[in-house]
Amino acid sequence: MKCAYAYYRIDPEQASLAATRIDLLLNAMATYCSQPPRRLARCDDPTTWMETYEGIADLTTFSVALNVAVQTYNCTEFIQGERHLECFSANK
C-alpha cells in the first residue's frame, strides 16, 4: 500500500473557503484509501496545510482521480504558490 501527501500554503483570508473545499475533496477521495483522508495544518504555520491519504492500492488511479477532484472542487483558488504531491510506500 502507498501513501500520498499534498501540501501547500493557503491565503489566510480564505481559510474558511479552503476548509470547505478541501473537506469536499477529502470526502471524494476516501474511496481510494483504506484510511480516511485527513487535513492537517503545520504547528508553527497554520497557513501551511497538508492532506494525508493512506492505504492507496492503485497509485495511478488515485492520482488521476485526485487531479480531477482538485479541478472539480477548485482547490487551487485559495493556494499561494504551488500544490505539492509526494508519494511514499512502507519499507519491506
Which ranges hold each PLM region?
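Short S/T/G/P-rich N-terminal loop/turn motif that feeds into the first structured element of a domain
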Residues: M1-L66, L85-K92
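A general structural signal for alpha-helical elements within enzymatic catalytic domains
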Residues: N27-A30, Q71-C75
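Conserved short beta-strand edge segments in small beta-sheet-based binding/regulatory domains
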Residues: T72-F88
